[in-house]
Swiss-Prot record:
SUPFAM superfamilies linked to this entry: 6-phosphogluconate dehydrogenase C-terminal domain-like, NAD(P)-binding Rossmann-fold domains
One Gene Ontology MF term: magnesium ion binding
Protein name, per record: Ketol-acid reductoisomerase (NADP(+))
Enzyme class: oxidoreductase
Annotated function: Involved in the biosynthesis of branched-chain amino acids (BCAA). Catalyzes an alkyl-migration followed by a ketol-acid reduction of (S)-2-acetolactate (S2AL) to yield (R)-2,3-dihydroxy-isovalerate. In the isomerase reaction, S2AL is rearranged via a Mg-dependent methyl migration to produce 3-hydroxy-3-methyl-2-ketobutyrate (HMKB). In the reductase reaction, this 2-ketoacid undergoes a metal-dependent reduction by NADPH to yield (R)-2,3-dihydroxy-isovalerate.
Domain annotation KARI N-terminal Rossmann: ranges: 1-182
Positions with a binding annotation for substrate: 252
Cofactor details (free text): Binds 2 magnesium ions per subunit.
Family: Belongs to the ketol-acid reductoisomerase family.
InterPro entries noted in UniProt: 6-PGluconate_DH-like_C_sf, KARI, KARI_C, KARI_N, KARI_prok, NAD(P)-bd_dom_sf
Gene designation: ilvC
GO terms classed as biological process: isoleucine biosynthetic process; L-valine biosynthetic process
Length: 332
């Protein structure tokens, strides 16, 4: 069984006198910085000078400065900027100002695992990864609960890396919901696999194929959209709350029998073999090398040729109209 911690297992005392620099003030940076501040920690914000987030962070009551200055002043540098710029920001501003005994902290371990950042051996390397978006991290904290997180220590130079890791996890509220111990390697590989095979890639492809199957058989696109896309959230919510078996016990008998007997026909052993291939391409570095190459050549335009497939697909054209019915104030 995985090692776990609850809020009562952890003390903030080991990091009460330390300064934590949150690098970045996007969705996660905003939420985690404010939660830590509200928990009584000494938080500073490191940002690109003149960036859009500077004024917002100041308005929220934070002391804001350049990334370089924040790195100099902090004991723990908690890096929450987008993955693909972490390497360059580290090279330009963090690395030159990093000194012995500090900690580099992340909410996703890819930059260290794939050596986009080559950290020295005289600092701690830690990770606190809330399993939810920043908005939920803040919302659950304000509700006196939290968003569960997975935590890891890759390098414990000071002998106090776990105190730092668990302290931050407690301060952002995640320990209230529960913490699970992982490793940088495990977090990166499982996170990317989930995104590609299931949560984003697999789910989007499954829904699109189901929509096409109904429309090609002569059914109205609007009805197909409701049946295979809109209602998906109802099922996912049940699975998240009650588990897969709990979902089966809460749907109709017809849905239960049909799903139990036909589901394996749709997601068969061939699909599982393809999932194994996706996992192997993550594990052996194939995906990382492909992604880095694409990003270096094309930047964010690397998405365009793939996004265009969905932009022009009938499911999106129908979906925009259907969503207007349910969310008339929505601006997509």
């Amino acid at each position: 069984m995985a090692q776990t911690w609850k809020d009562t297992d952890i003390s903030l005392d080991p990091i009460k006198d330390q300064t934590i620099a949150v690098i970045g003030y996007g969705i996660q940076g905003d939420a985690q910085a404010n939660n830590m501040k509200d928990s009584g920690l000494n938080v500073i914000i490191g940002l690109k000078e003149g960036g859009n987030s500077w004024k917002k962070a100041e308005a929220d009551g934070h002391k804001v400065m350049s990334v370089a200055d924040a790195t100099k002043q902090a004991d723990i540098i908690h890096i929450l900027i987008p993955d693909m710029i972490q390497g360059q920001v580290y090279k330009d501003e963090i690395g030159p100002n990093l000194s012995e005994g500090k900690a580099l902290s992340f909410s996703h371990a890819a930059a260290i695992y794939w050596k986009w950042i080559e950290a020295p051996n005289n600092v701690d390397l830690i990770m606190i990864a809330p399993k939810g978006p920043g908005s939920k991290v803040r919302e659950t904290y304000l509700d006196n609960f939290g968003t569960p997180a997975i935590v890891a220590v890759e390098q414990d130079f000071t002998g106090k890396a776990w105190d730092r890791t668990l302290g931050i996890a407690k301060a952002i509220g995640s320990a209230r919901a529960g913490l699970i111990k992982t490793a940088f390697k495990e977090e990166v590989e499982t996170d990317w696999f989930g995104e590609q095979a299931d949560l984003c890639g697999g789910a989007a492809s499954m829904v699109t194929n189901a929509f096409e199957t109904l429309v090609e058989a002569g059914y109205q696109p609007e009805i197909a959209y409701f049946e295979v896309l809109h209602e998906l959230k109802l099922i996912v919510d049940m699975i998240q709350r009650y588990g897969i078996n709990g979902m089966w016990r809460r749907v109709s008998e017809t849905a239960r029998y049909g799903g139990l007997t036909r589901g394996p026909m749709v997601m068969d052993s061939a699909n599982k073999e393809n999932m194994k291939k996706v996992l192997t391409m993550i594990q052996d570095g194939t995906f990382n090398n492909e992604w880095i190459s694409e990003y270096q050549k094309n930047g964010k335009d690397a998405f365009d040729k793939y996004m265009k497939q969905y932009d022009e697909h009938q499911i999106e054209k129908v979906g925009k109209e259907m969503r207007k019915m349910m969310w008339p104030d929505s601006t997509e």
